[in-house]
Structures are given as structure tokens and as C-alpha cells.
Amino acid sequence: MASSFSDLGLELMATGENAGTWGTKTNTNLQIIEKSIAGYVEQAVTSGGTTALSITDGDTTESTSVARHAVIKLTGTITGNSIVTVPDSIEKVYIVTNGTSGAYTVQFKTASGTGITFGVSEKTTRLVYSDGTNIVDAGFGGASDMEGRELVLDADGDTTITADTDDQIDIKIAGADDFQFTA
């Protein structure tokens, strides 16, 4: 019986197979696992098109297995709305950073499913997961300490809530302070 491969590209060796190379293949599998749970990679995005990320079976090369990594930073100057896809059937957690420049959206999705979209000014990091069909935003729950930073409420970034100083909250609409609340 010949080896088969998991969705992440791990070689699943058959009993009695790979005599003399079993150790090397196991080391490759361990490197693949490492990249899947702790790997970081930067990926240039095709401007106004689709960038398909892939996983190559039994291969630890970064450029041919970007979709395997835990943390993916999307880069490049885009001049049109762009889509980045990961293979269908992969069930995995991703931390995705939109590090692109240009006032266009970037969608991160599975090849044939749905996903999340970074707004035109949303140069942030998102925790998402693939359920094998779609990319789902993991979101967050509970209290969040903004540490005086702005909470951006819309895609173009001009509606915000800020607590710049102690005991005062500012609400900006269309970039101008419209409401202030003080204690």
C-alpha cells in the first residue's frame, strides 16, 4: 500500500514502507506541523484579481505551501478589489493580516466557499478559521481594552469612538467630533 497525504500535506506512510527514509520523512512531517501551528509567511496579493494559496503534499517550501501557515500577512500595492483563496477541505485556524496598500477590499476565502472581507481602510489582523467549506471570522467576546485607541465603526474609517483622555469619550462622524461625553 502506498503512502497517502493529509489535507495539510503530511505524508501518511503505509506499514513497512519507506525503509531507510522513514526518519527523513518524519522530520519533513514535523516541519509541516510546525508551520501549520506556528508558521509565519508574507504573501503578495494580485491586484484586482485572485491569489490562490496552495499546499503541496510532503513539501516544506514556503512559496508552494503558503496556505499551510498559521499566520499569513497579505502584502503589496493593490489597485483593485482582490481575493485570496485557500484550498477547499482544509480545516484550520488562520491569523490573517491585511498589510496591503491601496484603497480597495481584500477578501480571504476558500476556493469555492465564502469568507471575510477587509474593508478599504481596514489594515488589521483577523482571527479566522476554515471549516473546510468557508472562512469564518472567529470574532471576540467579553471586554476589550482599547488603551485609548480609536474604535473604527465603518469601512472608510471616518466614524469612530475614542477615549483619548480620562473621563471623556468622543464620537466622530464623517471625521468630525460630533458628540463628547464627560464624567
Model regions and ranges:
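Short, surface-exposed beta-edge/turn micro-motifs
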Residues: 67-70, 90-93, 124-125, 157-158, ...
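Residue-level signal for pocket-adjacent positions within structured domains
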Residues: 5-8, 79, 113, 130, ...
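Exposed extracellular interaction/assembly regions and N-terminal maturation sites
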Residues: 1-10, 16-105
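Extracellular disulfide-bonded cysteine-rich modules/repeats
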Residues: 21-28, 122-132, 168
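Intrinsic low-complexity, repeat-rich intrinsically disordered segments enriched
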Residues: 30, 40-54, 112-115, 134-183
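A structural detector for beta-sheet-dominated domains
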Residues: 13, 56, 73-75, 85-87, ...
